Amino acid sequence: MDTGEAAFGVASLRLRGSMASASSRRAPSYRDYDVFSIASSSRAEAEDDEEALKWAALEKLPTHARVRKGIVAAADDGQGSGAAGEVVDVAGLGFQERKHLLERLVRVAEEDHESFLLKLKQRIDRVGLDFPTIEVRYEHLSIDALAHVGSRGLPTFLNTTLNSLESLANLLHVVPNKKRPLNILHDVHGVIKPRRMTLLLGPPGSGKTTLLLALAGKLGSDLKVSGKVTYNGYGMDEFVAQRSAAYISQHDLHIPEMTVRETLAFSARCQGVGTRYDMLTELARREKAANIKPDPDLDVYMKAISVGGQETNIITDYVLKILGLDICADTIVGNEMLRGISGGQRKRVTTGEMIVGPARAMFMDEISTGLDSSTTFQIVKSLGQITSILGGTTVISLLQPAPETYNLFDDIILLSDGHIVYQGPREHVLEFFESMGFKCPDRKGVADFLQEVTSRKDQQQYWARTHQPYRYIPVQEFACAFQSFHVGQTLSDELSHPFDKSTSHPASLTTSTYGASKLELLRTCIARELLLMKRNMFVYRFRAFQLLVITIIVMTLFLRTNMHHETRTDGIVYLGALFFAMVAHMFNGFSELAMATIKLPVFFKQRDYLFFPSWAYTIPTWILKIPISCFEVAITVFLSYYVIGFDPNVGRLFKQYLLLLLVNQMAAALFRFIAALGRTMVVANTLASFALLVLLVLSGFILSHHDVKKWWIWGYWISPLQYAMNAIAVNEFLGHKWNRLVQGTNTTLGIEVLKSRGMFTEAKWYWIGVGALFGYVIVFNILFTIALGYLKPSGKAQQILSEEALKEKHANITGETINDPRNSASSGQTTNTRRNAAPGEASENRRGMVLPFAPLAVAFNNIRYSVDMPPEMKAQGVDQDRLLLLKGVSGSFRPGVLTALMGVSGAGKTTLMDVLAGRKTGGYIEGDISISGYPKKQETFARVSGYCEQNDIHSPNVTVYESLAYSAWLRLPSDVDSETRKMFIEQVMELVELNPLRDALVGLPGVNGLSTEQRKRLTIAVELVANPSIIFMDEPTSGLDARAAAIVMRTVRNTVDTGRTVVCTIHQPSIDIFEAFDELFLMKRGGEEIYVGPLGHHSCDLIEYFEGVEGVSKIKPGYNPATWMLEVTTLAQEDVLGISFTDVYKNSDLYQRNQSLIKGISRPPQGSKDLFFPTQFSQSFSTQCMACLWKQNLSYWRNPPYTVVRFFFSLIVALMFGTIFWRLGSKRSRQQDLFNAMGSMYAAVLFMGISYSSSVQPVVAVERTVFYRERAAGMYSALPYAFGQVVVELPYVLVQSAVYGVIVYAMIGFEWEAKKFFWYLYFMYFTLLYFTFYGMLAVGLTPSYNIASIVSSFFYGIWNLFSGFVIPRPSMPVWWRWYSWACPVSWTLYGLVASQFGDLKEPLRDTGVPIDVFLREYFGFKHDFLGVVAVAVAGFATLFAVSFSLSIKMLNFQRR
């Protein structure tokens, strides 16, 4: 619930006794907290009078004006006094004023937050107001889903096709549904009380997220739900649940270009102030009646958070402070390709985005992922204070809560396999499990115990009834036992008495759909869109530059000194120029597709959270782009109009400008609508290409109006480009330049030209065209709004379930025996991660690590790392050129020693690891790094090291087993045979417990496939199968629950025990995980080390060191040493103690020991040799090629949004073309017949090619991110990767071009001659191939998919212009004729037309010229040149493929 409810909810208007008399200046006898500023006798009389006068002036204002005014103390007044301040409008507080106000109210969040909230509560209580509260009940709640199980669930080409047909048959009730019902939650019930913090625990897959979504009213409609959820006795249909409660997702979806402050401010503005304003007015009224004068600072704060419509509300600054985000408030959020804040900070932004709003109930899903334990503790503590003091209702799901964080909660809900095992007070949970025979060991966190005690694999170690043999207690038995436990009985009794609705506070539940007025939401979205346009200005500048270049080319290509107004042929050339101008703006609008699609995930999240209606998003997107459209069209029209030699009439110039402006706007609106319809980049690209194709073919230029078949004439009349083409042609050809009468007729040349292409000849068609285009602009924007308003986000978080996993789940619930030999080996393992594990267990787990390796040590001395100073910091007055992130760090990592690299968020842990592992791509590195005494060489180091990145990056369309097989194939030495390799993979899978997931698809994070913890285990396994000597792990337990973290740490410990060097950054370890480490490398914020040394038994060495520092508080018995260590070494503690822990460390014996150790390791051992490998990579070039092709083949087969959609796109386009150009290929008696046939070829080549090029780009962009990780790991060189990416396309394009070619060739009616047929297939195949490879090349040459799509659209336009259809090669000026030979599309058209018609001698009926002569003279096409054309077309495919390979090899756009 709202932190700023730090103020309140609406009052219950209940008075608690008489107020003090109006004449009294003295507060009544409330002494608990000094909430109110009372004139002190020690103050000077003048100050007292001045203060009194200001308050008196405020008191005289009407209530609505008084709540907007407050007295702000001067910046240097640290006492919170308003005496020296001034009266201000609270809605207009500046950044510095807000900052100083918060400093006075909450100087240090850890220490002052609770007293601040108590002051707020005291002020509310004082006048007899109450906070609204919410009690959430859920009764007999069951949730089921339908899913395919096993291999049928994999999204392969075949499965997707079958599933689509099956879904259609299910709708028609032809066949039964073959999906299996999966039970997610089973008959759960409980009560969540206000003012109590509830912790939701449970292993992955237990149903935690589903329960939270159900309680927050955000379940998807595809789930089957029974039972009910009520708020204060009201059903979900009686109020707006999405605004009464806030759900905080575990997935961090944010706009990367916005800063942290901007992200939270936007959210606060959208969610509004709720009922704070109403409460404030009542509060002010009562205080005035009682003559109570509140503390000025508190008064200003409460007023400021109650006034809506502020660009940046002070509540944003408050939330930034309590979440520890104030240090990065003005840094952009960023993403994988755009450097921004850290993963832990991004997770806090996700939390802050919702708690700035006024919701009274909060459901938080895994909000601590990526955070260190002290930060998690502080955040949960702050949330707990808000909950208990201000009457909130809070449920938080945490994966690995430390004991001190666990103790902050009042109630526990423990879920396991969809059953509630326990819900009730935290104090009784251990009592319940002890009654079942299980006891939590000493030095074991209770939360960790609870996560593991219901697991079949972990339960036995906690069995406490030594006099009885252990038996597995299934989940169902726990759930039944809880019903008879006294806590369960109390809960049942409570549920049997319905909530009394009459006691529900009227302001508890929200009935309004949105948090602010519609006008305010529109203003907010306009402000954000302007901000994003400013941040993305490069895109618009680049687009304008492209248009300028194209315009210059058009001007010089259609130069008026070369253009004539003599014949109908001259007119057709001018018509081509007009057509191209129109097409250029259609292509320009194509780039809107990528920009709109990229923003959709964030839009859908905010829409579902009811931040704003879809129209508030679409109107700014449309309206704010109009000035850009005006500028872009001005470039093309005003520069080229007179140079080309269009009719020299100013009126016609501006009419052409208006028409092309409408085309530009229509195109942008159309592609935004298609983006909303497709929702994924691949599908949207395919739909957009299809739409573009249909519109242009039916525009009246490619195919004459008179030749459109009757069954397609409706398409002609609804095509916006038909109206545009007719209007722009009428505007030109009815001008005086074309008024000359054609010899032997009574019609002008202009009208003859229009008639020859089947266009309309009346002037009214210009205004009809303008009206139609304006209508389409409105219609497409309305459709865009409707699509965004009603369609669901694409892709669901899903996991492919195997039969084995289902059986195991059923057995865990019921207690039945599992007969699965594959898992039996691991079923007896425990999660004991301590170093004194049973010898038998250790040797059993280590058996998968027996491949030979060389133990290696890493030493580094005085490592400094800096980056260029961010512009945001320079703007705030920082004058240095570089920002130093690591300040002379030294240390060593040794074989057989497991080192924990720790520190608070922002300490530089990941930065140090990236520097040591050689993963930094930018910045400035200084210092020495040696490997077993020899200077580090990155190429060699990559062969012997592994790096588990914090972001789990994997190819999404392969299974878990295939990911491991691929890694092992490429990274294990070539002398390891296939059988050994497979056995090694199996052993690693067993160690990391991935066997049940072996056939699960990896998927994309947050979209589909593996869960966070499963993905994390896969990341570790991928590195382990490489058998490295040195392993770096960046937060291997982040995002895992306690049990999964224990599995991972057991694996890591076993890896170390084989003699490897392992270093892990770790954020929030439990006691047993922390003490699984041998040594600690502790850093503080700012990039300096403060402890480097052994932990000792039960962390005794670490504790002894820090307790030896004067002033440091002693550790409490049983307290987590990791948490204590982080708490006592904060910067705030340094200020309190007046010391620097860095200096303490540098002056210690430990530092001298480490320096000696570094010197020793930095000298090569006697008789040793530097690392040397005869080849750079483990495998030969040919093996790398085969492995990359193997993975790409699997990826393509399982990527139906790409392969299936593209296949059916080719099929539909073929049928469409066949019906539009039906039998036109057999007609060749007139010039127009040849133009029609060539039009079918031109349209197919250009637009199918564009579709293939556009749709491959997002696929390559996703895989390129994986490629950067795999190349950095030394798996392969760039060329084999490019080989796999290129070669895998060959069979797909072959099948698709063959399907298209056969259908189109037959339906259009080209000549049935084997040679001509195969020439047609040949040219179509290589054309689609070179377009596909060009799409890859565009991604390879640019940093992002967005830029690639804009660059591509530029070249599509150029190729269209020089294709030979818009203007034939002989008609081009001599200075541009050369480029037609460099344009691949012109070669394709040459080949297609010349192979079909170039050998025909029959004369044309309308001119009498033989066909072959006409083709040679008008187009420059010769039949005997076909061999050269064939080689050239294949050559372009080869050129683009080779260029893509070189771009991948030489360019790296990843910034680290």
From Swiss-Prot:
Task: Give the CDD domains listed for this entry.
Answer: ABCG_PDR_domain2
The residues that hold ATP 1 are 202-209
Q: Which UniProt keywords apply?
A: ATP-binding, Membrane, Nucleotide-binding, Repeat, Transmembrane, Transmembrane helix, Transport
Chain sites annotated for binding ATP 2: 903-910
Cellular localization per UniProt: Membrane
Q: Name one GO cellular component term.
A: membrane
Q: Where is the ABC transmembrane type-2 domain?
A: 520-733, 1183-1397
Q: Where is this region: Disordered?
A: 812-844
Q: What are the TM regions of this chain, as residue ranges?
A: 538-558, 571-591, 626-646, 658-678, 682-702, 768-788, 1202-1222, 1242-1262, 1290-1310, 1317-1337, 1347-1367, 1378-1398, 1425-1445
Q: Where is the composition biased (Polar residues)?
A: 814-835
UniProt cross-references to InterPro entries, sorted A to Z: AAA+_ATPase, ABC2_TM, ABC_transporter-like_ATP-bd, ABCG_dom, ABCG_PDR_2, P-loop_NTPase, PDR_assoc
Its principal location?
A: membrane
PROSITE patterns the UniProt entry points to: ABC_TRANSPORTER_2
Instruction: Report the residue ranges that make up the ABC transporter domain in this protein.
Output: 169-442, 858-1110
- Say which domain of life the source belongs to: Eukaryota
Q: Matching Pfam families, A to Z?
A: ABC2_membrane, ABC2_membrane_7, ABC_tran, PDR_assoc
Q: Which GO terms describe its molecular function?
A: ABC-type transporter activity; ATP binding; ATP hydrolysis activity
Q: Which family does it belong to?
A: Belongs to the ABC transporter superfamily. ABCG family. PDR (TC 3.A.1.205) subfamily.
PANTHER family, A to Z: ABC TRANSPORTER G FAMILY MEMBER 39-LIKE, PLEIOTROPIC DRUG RESISTANCE PROTEIN 1-LIKE ISOFORM X1
- Function, in words: May be a general defense protein.
The name on file for this protein is ABC transporter G family member 44
The encoding gene is ABCG44
